[in-house]
Amino acid sequence: METPHIPVLLEEVLESFSRVPEGYFVDCTLGYAGHSSEILKRYDHLKHIGIDRDDEALAFSKKRLEPFRDRSTLYKGTFATVLPTLKEAPVTALLADFGVSSLQLDKKERGFAFDSETLDMRMDANAPLSAYEVVNTYPKEKLEYIFDTYGEVRSYKKLASAVVDARAKAPIESAKALSEIAKGVIPPGGKIHPATLMFQAIRIEVNNELGEIEGLLDAIEAKHYEGEVVSLITFHSLEDRLVKNRFRKWSQECICDPHAIRCTCGKKHALGKALSRKPVTASKEELRVNPRSRSAKLRSFRFKSDS
């Protein structure tokens, strides 16, 4: 079976789970099962749960994981909603890769690519909100907010005005047309396409990506297991900040008010510890083979174990 997506930081992810005990491995962003298939091959003491909201990805992964059908179960939905409902236990390894898959980026009908003839960007094709609605119906002030907050676009006001001016003449029907608007506002240059940050912002809005990550972290915090390792791959600073701050919170022994004169909590409140101080990034070899890995950052956290 031809693999449409190269999993990022694969060896580093595998290594992060090298000491997990017997139990369930949950892939919260199953995609095309690149990480899952390799983890199932290497760690035969783990059973597998895959979660995704993309029907196409689930159908592909079901076939790809057929050799492991006795150890694998797939669920459709967002990870923030599915994870709290899982009955399978104990979960000893959990992975989430928050990037958009290469297949989604490359398939023009999905509307993620800069030259797509559609304007969609939905991870779940049945979801009510698409990029078309965001671009063509959101008021200028709301576009400014998402371009600034989710895309960290410097010229967010100019960009929002350009979008509103363009759609006043005719609806913006394609990602390609939207890219041209960005090119007219943001000068070319540097390593990324002028529309990159705008597309990121719209995609985050359409799929509630930051809200989903917060929901996942809340679900993990509410229900985790002894010795469980959580490995999360982020692709931009907004995602990484959420993960870094939550891992820092989970690592804190003291939960007293920062302004307290002395500690009264006993300093025994850490849930576990991060496996590395800084995020793990792609090697030079991986960057050569898969340039899309350049923005990937892996952070891993191990919950405490009595043993």
UniProtKB/Swiss-Prot annotation:
Protein's UniProt name: Ribosomal RNA small subunit methyltransferase H
Any one biological process term the GO annotation gives: rRNA base methylation
Entry keyword set: Cytoplasm, Methyltransferase, rRNA processing, S-adenosyl-L-methionine, Transferase
S-S pairs: none
Primary location recorded for the protein, binned into one broad class: cytoplasm
EC numbers, comma separated: 2.1.1.199
Binding site for S-adenosyl-L-methionine: A33, G34, H35, D52, L83, D97, Q104
Catalytic activity line of the entry: cytidine(1402) in 16S rRNA + S-adenosyl-L-methionine = N(4)-methylcytidine(1402) in 16S rRNA + S-adenosyl-L-homocysteine + H(+)
Subcellular localization: Cytoplasm
Name of the gene encoding the protein in the UniProt record: rsmH
Signal peptide, first to last residue: none
Enzyme class: transferase
Pfam families, per the entry: Methyltransf_5
GO molecular function, one term: rRNA (cytosine-N4-)-methyltransferase activity
Any one GO CC term of the record: cytoplasm
Similarity remark: Belongs to the methyltransferase superfamily. RsmH family.
NCBIfam families: 16S rRNA (cytosine(1402)-N(4))-methyltransferase RsmH (TIGR00006)
Protein function: Specifically methylates the N4 position of cytidine in position 1402 (C1402) of 16S rRNA.
